[in-house]
Swiss-Prot record:
GO terms for molecular function: argininosuccinate lyase activity. PANTHER family: ARGININOSUCCINATE LYASE. It is found in: Cytoplasm. The gene is argH. This is Argininosuccinate lyase.
Length: 490
């Protein structure tokens, strides 16, 4: 995982703790490549603040910042010493500028430093996941807009239940993804708080400015209590739970597409399928099966994270080193799965004739007939019994008439017009009648798709605002750091 266990000196652990067989076990240096850039940003912001607060001299700050530039140019792979990226960078800085490099860690602990780096990187990954959900929602809504009148079977218990439309079906997943987007954005708000200045957990006697480092790093504020700031990892739980929820949404969509593909309702584009190594006729929905499996990956990560955190005493424990990888891995997996699922839907061929034919199977319009009778004054429970009796006899008008004679004691025509019943039996007419808010009727769906588009636009703007704020902070940090170039000692 890291460099030779018997060579190199870690400036944090010193000679006494720098060697031994456990060094590799303790090390997270290789895994920390993900937060390498985050650590450099955190170091720069901290050094600028130390200088501005007259805690270290400007010449020392300039030297340290210059060394950090060298470390960045050399890359993570050049870090050979240190049990983690934070210690390794500090070691590299001291190697370049001597003892003045040791001032970089003034008024700071690795506890608050690590927490800041995790939050700094995690927020970027959360926004990437948000972007993926936005693109998926847009694709779902685009395809739905093309199929507001494409009738299809709707299911409960995987049995034909009621006819609906492809638009109604896809909009249901767009709605679920909108909630997933909302959960990710909510998590972002709690991730994007700075723990810097908490030090080990009890703060520091130095006259630091926590708000300044938060500003330079683009955080929306600070985690006020220093013990909470250093030890809290609930933001990881929230993020991983949001990722697992998103993966569960995608798993349902993927499962549907696998089933629909088997039934001949939809055909995935070749780019989202594969064939068999032995059976040349096969076209397998492999990508959807892997999307489906992502729900297991993310749920396992959430369970592992919760188990790691369960029962940890305040304030810092090394168990936390094993915590954040689960959040990163969950976000990686679900972001890719979202992109793949969206592409599969966008390029799929919905087989309208097959869908239309299947829409009426299993007497799926039965509820519509019962509703019609109830509208004409027949108690719904009685109408339900009548239609259930007719379903046993075939579910056509003749069966309904016979059931009416037995249950209502007279002809069906005394209660409802035959033409109305026949319309209720027709899947397309049945769908068109369901124009209540949220229903599948074309007019209702047009309104729903419009509202979904507006919500999508609002969420896209929220993403732009957050990324814009981070970019502004990065520009300001770069401007301030660059101003030290002219003061750097020769």
């Amino acid at each position: 995982m890291t460099g030779d266990a018997d060579e190199g000196r870690d400036v944090v652990r010193r000679d006494r703790f720098s060697g031994g067989p456990a060094r590799g076990f303790l090390s997270s240096l290789a895994a920390d490549e993900r937060i390498f850039e985050a650590d450099l940003a955190v170091d720069r912001a901290h050094v600028v603040m130390l200088d501005e607060q007259d805690i270290i001299g400007t010449d020392d700050a300039a030297a340290i910042l210059g060394a950090l530039d060298d470390v960045e140019a050399a890359g993570h792979g050049s870090l050979t010493d240190g049990e983690d990226v934070h210690a390794a960078i500090e070691t590299a800085v001291i190697e370049r500028v001597g003892d003045r490099g040791g001032k970089m860690h003034t008024a700071r602990s690795r506890n608050d430093e690590v927490a800041a780096c995790i939050r700094y990187r995690l927020r970027e990954d959360v926004l990437a996941a948000v972007e993926a959900t936005l693109e998926a929602r847009e694709m779902l809504l685009d395809v739905a807009g093309d199929h507001t009148e494409t009738v299809m079977p709707g299911f409960t218990h995987l049995q034909p239940a009621q006819p609906t439309t492809v638009a109604h079906y896809l909009h249901s997943y767009a709605s679920a993804l909108a909630r997933d987007t909302e959960r990710l954005l909510d998590a972002y708000g709690r991730i994007n708080r700075s723990p810097l200045g908490a030090a080990a957990f009890a703060g520091t006697p130095f006259d630091i400015d926590r708000e300044r480092t938060a500003e330079l790093l683009g955080f929306d504020g600070v985690v006020r209590n220093s013990m909470d700031a250093a030890s809290a990892r609930d933001f990881l739980v929230e993020t991983t739970a949001a990722a697992a929820g998103l993966a569960t949404t995608l798993s349902g969509l993927a499962e549907d597409l696998v089933v629909f593909s088997k039934a001949g309702y939809v055909e995935l584009d070749d780019a989202y399928a594969s064939t068999s190594s032995i059976m040349p006729q096969k076209k397998n929905p492999d990508t959807m099966e892997l999307v489906r499996a992502t729900a297991g990956d993310t749920a396992a990560g959430l369970n592992a994270l919760l188990t790691i955190l369960k029962g940890l005493p305040r304030a810092y424990n090394r168990d936390l080193q094993r915590a954040h990888p689960h959040a990163f891995e969950a976000l990686d997996a679900v972001t890719e799965a979202t992109e793949v699922a969206a592409g599969a839907v966008a390029t799929a061929d919905w087989k309208e004739p097959a869908l239309s034919e299947a829409a009426g199977e299993g007497f799926s319009t039965a509820t519509g007939v019962a509703d019609l009778l109830a509208m004409e004054g027949v108690p719904f429970r009685t109408a339900h019994e009548l239609v259930a009796r007719a379903a046993e006899a075939g579910g056509d008008y003749a069966a309904l008439s016979a059931a009416a004679e037995d249950i209502l004691g007279g002809p069906l025509s005394e209660h409802v017009d035959k033409a109305a019943v026949e319309a209720a039996l027709d899947p397309e007419s049945s769908v068109a009648s369901r124009d209540s808010l949220g229903g599948p009727a074309p007019e209702s769906m047009a309104a729903a798709l419009s509202a979904a588009g507006q919500r999508l636009d609002a969420d896209a703007e929220a993403l732009r605002e957050r990324r814009g704020a981070l970019a502004t902070a990065a520009d300001e940090r770069e401007r301030v750091v660059s101003s030290y170039d002219s003061t750097a000692p020769e």
